[in-house]
Amino acid sequence: MVNKFLYPRGGSESYMLYLAEYLKKIGHEIEYFGMYDENNTVGNSKGLYTKNMDFHSKGLARFLYPFKIIYSFEAKKKIMQVIDDFKPDIVHMNNINFQLTPSIIYGIKKKKIPLVQTVHDYQMICPNHLLYNFDKNIPCEKCVKGSHMNCIKNKCIHGSGVKSVIGAIEAKLYSWIETYKKVDLYICPSYFLENKLLSAKGYYKGKTKTIHNFINKEKFSNNQRKEEDYIAFIGRFSKEKGIENLAGAAKLLPQYNFIAAGSGPDEGMLKGIENIRLTGFLTGDRLTELMGNAKVMILPSVWYENCPISILEAHCMGVPVMAMNSGGMAELIKDGVTGTLIDDPSPEGIALKLRETLENEEYYINLRENCKKEKDNILSVEDYAEILIKEYQKLIAR
């Protein structure tokens, strides 16, 4: 298993660690490769990792990072050494850019090992990984088939000209030399993402498979739901997550209570609104309880969400979800059956759909009951692994 971070940090790490733990449980041998960090919870028997890259450091190392995050000779060399020692049947990559770089693909394929990658974002077709223009607060696909100069012009990466130049160079380089063509199979968590890859480059054809994300179904199915009168938002407080529009909708609906769990740069937009309570960043049982007891959960994301696990978790607990009719969200919610899809992302559009959903009691009760049935269609880690292993076996047998 390959990922730049080897400890629980975000969604891709949680996915990798949980999946790998289950694969080990059923008899598979697994080793890991990534960046060294004192927080690492997994590793490899050779003890080989790339050096930790602190992008906030000062001095000479900082000036060398632009070169290292485009192509890493260190990462390529070390992953080949790990492969020589462990002799895997297959390599499964997750997030590799910047800290590991796509250079490792060349090292892996030099060893003639089948290579799979789970695609957690739009990195291969968009320099900022999100298909999103932060300045205009709208989805953006200008680099998908157009020039990567758009990334530089719009300062798409953290609003930084330097970072955007580096990101554009990296994207252009690996697109030009067709590095991603060398991967044998791409696991896509949504059909939306799969279709974006296929429309971007012809060489992805025949190399993609959509498998929706899995969750710990036992944990969420056993939740004792005690419905309370609030609308839940769980996520990062930032523009692309639709925080500004959520704040506006709450102001238009003073009769409804909102609870927002998370943190982020735009938290100020939610402060001072009387019917919004902020809990801070929550994890574990507190987060599950907040989600499970909500009247509905809302995802007002402006960017194209891939396959939000929170939607799967909410449905498993019988909580209807309201989300934008875009990206992978539209695949997970059956409009009018397990939730409501919102076409108009404005505060007025969100407020209208909330009223329509919550003020029609019969409609709302049907949503809730349908969600309870929907959990049978959600993948567990056992279901997911069964599908994945079959794909592994096909590649190994070639």
Give the ranges of each region predicted by the language model.
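Conserved donor-binding/catalytic core segment of Leloir-type glycosyltransferases
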Residues: 187, 224-241, 247-251, 259
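A short, well-ordered alpha-helix in the C-terminal region of glycosyltransferases
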Residues: 349, 356, 363-378, 384-390
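Nucleotide-activated donor-binding/catalytic signature segment of Leloir-type glycosyltransferases, i.e.
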Residues: 268-289
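Carbohydrate-associated surface elements
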Residues: 192, 214
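Conserved acidic donor-binding segment of nucleotide-sugar-dependent glycosyltransferases
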Residues: 280, 335-336, 340-347, 356-362
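Short hydrophobic beta-strand element within catalytic cores of glycosyltransferases
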Residues: 320-323
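Membrane-proximal helix-turn-helix segments that form the acceptor-binding/catalytic region
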Residues: 110, 123, 138-186
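N-terminal strand-loop element at the rim of the active site
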Residues: 3-9, 21-73, 77-85, 264
